[in-house]
Amino acid sequence: VSLPLIDAHVALAGYADLWVALVLGLALLAWARWLLFREPRQWLLAVLLVACLPAIKLEGAIWLLAFVAVALLERLPRRWRWVLPGGVVLLLAVILGADLLGVPLPSVGKVHIGWGRIDIAGVASYTLKWHAVGGPMLASLYELPNWHLLWYLLPALIVWRWRDVCRSEAARLLGLFVLLQLAALFVLFFLTSASAWAEDFTSVNRLILQVVPGVLVFVAVLLRDPASANEKPVRETDLPGLRKPATRG
């Protein structure tokens, strides 16, 4: 709560970024409890909260898709977790090559993605090309007084708790979600005309603000006492509606 940029947004009226961050943070906290303790009501709460994101702001639809992708990966049997995603990536590459990919996003419309461009119906069209905005991005994260020591401490914490990252499925999945968020921001700022937002330091930190909840939940999972790290294994009957009826023996 003491992060300077969050304090600034609390005092500003009309910006939805803080609300996106709040709802996403609550969803990820609920999902983390599902991953750690297999509480079905927390899984339902996470799904309901994430489903609200597109109604708040355009970026919410992107985070919804990222969450769905990671949540589906978590539900796959372990032997399929890399085979199936690899097949999906290959299929997407073929579709992109044929310039056929159109994705409907809630409250946004159809998004057409092809090599070299992204067209969002009724919103904008982006031509994909490299923009060298590494300097402003690093300044936003490390030099300007926006995030205290958050982005300095995160890499150090990952190195310190690397064994926990390898052992904890919850940490790995939350980390994957954060990586998908960072990848989306990389494409936006380094490959589209939105790079101007990074160069003049306007919207870049407002979008980074939406990544912070995932980072903080990931950090909280890593900092758990190893002695209390009793993650429950997933079972097919854990999710609501999938419980098998009791049988008399």
Regions found by a protein language model. Give the residues of each.
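Multi-pass, polyprenyl lipid-linked donor-dependent membrane glycosyltransferases
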Residues: 6-26, 56
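Extracytoplasmic catalytic-loop and juxtamembrane helix elements of membrane-embedded
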Residues: 99-132, 193-202
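Transmembrane alpha-helix segments characteristic
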Residues: 1-2, 48-50, 167-194
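Membrane-interface helix-loop-helix junctions at transmembrane boundaries of multi-pass membrane enzymes
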Residues: 38-41, 77-83, 159-179
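Membrane-interface alpha helices of multi-pass inner-membrane proteins
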Residues: 1, 9, 31, 42-58, ...
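Hydrophobic, aromatic-rich transmembrane alpha-helices
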Residues: 72, 133-175
